[in-house]
Amino acid sequence: MRKNKDLWVDWLTKYETETQNMRLGENYSLAESLFETLNDISAETRGAREIRPTDRSITGLLKVAPDQPQIPFESSLERDFAILMTGRRGVFSIEAQPVTIRYLDDLGKERTYTPDFLITRYRHELEQPESGLHTMLVEIKYTSDLNGKNQPTLLQKFKHAKQWAEFKGWSFSVFTEKEIRTSELERTRELLPYRFLESETPIERAVYLFVRRHKVTTIRKIADALHNFSAEQVHTEVLKMLATHQLF
């Protein structure tokens, strides 16, 4: 008899989640040396805090960019997932509770299931040969919920969601706190406020050309090289460019 915690390991949606996270997470590798200086330069922007169990049931609206609609969420984990996706290069849109799927359970009774998110992203960012967009239905669940008393019901819901998604040419994945609450999330959370700043075009171009020439560098080195601008201006512009994927 397999233990509960092992049931999900080989399940396709979990496997897809882990491999997709690993592949998409590589987008941060080149930017890492730039971002490591953030704690020293702008520690006051840190908004991360420890998530307590009582935060599970919070609801609200998340604004991730000035030109995009707010994203509704019904738990802190859903909010964190939306933030995580915001930081991933190639993500085109994040839609909450996009569709309700109807299906028959084992007893022939009609049931409904509404996944938490629909993520659309460019295929080339996933290193896939096909051009165009890739669409993924997503369910957000705590690991304890996956392995709890409702596990059989969840498995049935997810099975039908996966079949429905494949019929549409989409995919379906389950994300837990293990995939969401990572160092990647903390970096994205800290960069989020910079997405709302106006760009300083001369600084932006100078930063872009410097990074393009030197490939891997640090914010401090960029600021030292671009002596026509103040260090504060350069720091802010670099962080904004990281937040909006203009660098790496």
Feature-to-residue mapping (PLM):
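Electrostatic, structured charged patches in enzyme active sites and in nucleic-acid/phosphate-binding
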Residues: 1-248
